[in-house]
């Protein structure tokens, strides 16, 4: 009897144990990452040929304590290597694990290689050669703390390489994991199986091979036992011949069918090739088709199973499309696949909840480093009076109501950018802004007392409902998370897409960027303030401090300002402001752009202006600014400096976002200034629900 070890992906150990026992293995013991078992020589070959779940089959050779590199060398050399393989065979060493002595896996592999070579040369036998790419023998060494475990890898290449897939092809799941997904899906052999996002067809091919009794190792051309000294070619040929006979019989007797589709024509072509190489191409119909076009291939029966590994996405900007995809799949299943089963494997349980289906079973597994879940559902047959469940119904109803109200108003006002929803309902804590035919959803980060999973699921419901109510394409929705922050965090960069969208605000044309920054380049709540500046600017010299992207300057320029001066510390935003000015034909020398610390520039400037707009940060301690700034503490000093630049009869429009800001009217009076609060006049309909979003003042000489 041989003592053996079969490795597998985390989470599949019990499934592998059952499979090995069915093959005839005895004394099976599950450990993390695999199963120890025993079997005769025939069982060795059968496990290699027939295991759909094992990553590798190992023949353990021994263990040794490693307190020094010499311990490792002597421990390896103690094994009788001349009984393991002939000197004419090539070998390679795979070494994993480190300890205080062996701190580099390459060094560990070198010591093992030296010990094996010396074991042959000490017996005056030819020195075996190393072949890292295609060795006859693979030696695996695992070092855990002070113990090294040494084994022969009888598989050679990993057993997930069945021989039907081009190694250069990209596969999101290995064939061994795909087989486990099929086994856990609840699909019954002989019933239809459909994968609407099949990619290169791995799930369907593994299912078809299982259904037709085709051994997963049947198409492999190379094995790790070919150079093993104890290899019994006669028994191997018997195992191989039996597998070939069973495959022919299974294919001839199988009567059901498999269906695969994907939106990418190239991967569908690869799937067809893979299925043909696997010997089951005639059983699978592949189509180029988007999920939105998915229909039941057997509307009159029999019932079957939809099985897939849908995309899950790690980038925030991909989530809206994925949420829409899963929501759509859920609706299609309910509408067209009543009575069928559904099984999805995903790294995102939150996305699976967008299906709006209740799972009957679920399994956990690892896909490489990713924690994944497989959920199985039974889709109830629909009845004539069945009504589709609403996602985030209260939110959807409020958004629909707001849309009806604001869409007409915005059209009459001549604006393309406006707020549709602003945390109107506390449990749906987001802002929804429309930019022409795009939508930005900003999630206000939930407090730490809220369960993160529930908060994420609520956000996914919001995304699905937003796409549905507004009737937009998922790729026209941008998702952002906004935390309460200090200073001008609109300068925080989120991406590098560099995609700009031209929008209209009254008579101004402006560039916005919806993806690369936390803010978009246009503060929507200041829309009326900008219009007022345009109306006040005719024939005047205009100064815009903390200018951001210069949208207020554009309105002043279009309003007939004699000159404009735009000051900001960010080169990025000044270049943006220049683009905005150019877009509106404001290109003459009278429109100056200055990159500077606004507070320092203000103290040193000696020019005069008729109209000044300043919208400073609530707080800033930027390294590029000389001093920390607090708008509540420092606004009087700011007004003192501004007064020096204000021409007689001039006006300062002062705005900030500090909640509870208190203007020091007595202090202003001592400076010879007076203030008129115009906050309510600057709040348009879409911001009437949030009266503290900013405060705004007109300041003139007393």
Curated annotation (Swiss-Prot):
**Enzyme group, top EC level?**
transferase
Highest taxon of source: Bacteria
Q: Extract one GO molecular function annotation from the record.
A: 23S rRNA (guanine(2445)-N(2))-methyltransferase activity
Annotated THUMP domain ranges read 43-154
Q: Name one GO cellular component term.
A: cytoplasm
Q: What is its EC number?
A: 2.1.1.173, 2.1.1.264
SMART domains listed in its UniProt record: THUMP
The places in or outside the cell where this protein is found are: Cytoplasm
Query: Which UniProt keywords are given for this protein, alphabetically ordered?
Result: Cytoplasm, Methyltransferase, RNA-binding, rRNA processing, S-adenosyl-L-methionine, Transferase
Q: Which residues form a coiled coil?
A: none
Q: Which reaction does it catalyse?
A: guanosine(2445) in 23S rRNA + S-adenosyl-L-methionine = N(2)-methylguanosine(2445) in 23S rRNA + S-adenosyl-L-homocysteine + H(+); guanosine(2069) in 23S rRNA + S-adenosyl-L-methionine = N(2)-methylguanosine(2069) in 23S rRNA + S-adenosyl-L-homocysteine + H(+)
Q: Which PANTHER family match?
A: RIBOSOMAL RNA LARGE SUBUNIT METHYLTRANSFERASE K/L (PTHR47313), RIBOSOMAL RNA LARGE SUBUNIT METHYLTRANSFERASE K_L (PTHR47313:SF1)
Q: Which NCBIfam families match?
A: PRK11783.1 (NF008748)
- Report the family membership: Belongs to the methyltransferase superfamily. RlmKL family.
Q: What does this protein do?
A: Specifically methylates the guanine in position 2445 (m2G2445) and the guanine in position 2069 (m7G2069) of 23S rRNA.
Supply the name of the protein: Ribosomal RNA large subunit methyltransferase K/L
Gene that this polypeptide is encoded by: rlmL
